[in-house]
């Protein structure tokens, strides 16, 4: 993990209506992300996303410049946004990995 980030292992992840909507209508969703400034213009409608934003995860490793308030092995959940990436949605924005992957990154808050 980079500075300020936490590497977590996905333990469980729900299937949300948003996941289904992105799967079926990615072009519309990405248009909204572009309009809101959540996705760079160079990322097109065919960008791949690793979905999963309603999750329970386990802390695996901390990056530099983190407070490490919770011990490695703690179970966590979070608001699925990365403040370090202008509010990019975990598991909904291209360039972020969601909890359908085995491991993914979160910002330490």
Q: What label would you give each PLM region?
A:
Residues 19-22, 89:
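Short, glycine/acidic-enriched capping/hinge loops at junctions between secondary-structure elements
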Residues 41-53, 79-109:
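NAD(P)H dinucleotide-binding glycine-rich loop of Rossmann-like/cofactor-binding domains
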Residues 16:
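Short cysteine clusters
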Residues 21-29:
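Short Gly/aromatic-enriched secondary-structure transition segments
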Residues 1-13, 28-82:
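Glycine-rich beta-strand-centered segment in the early N-terminal region that forms part
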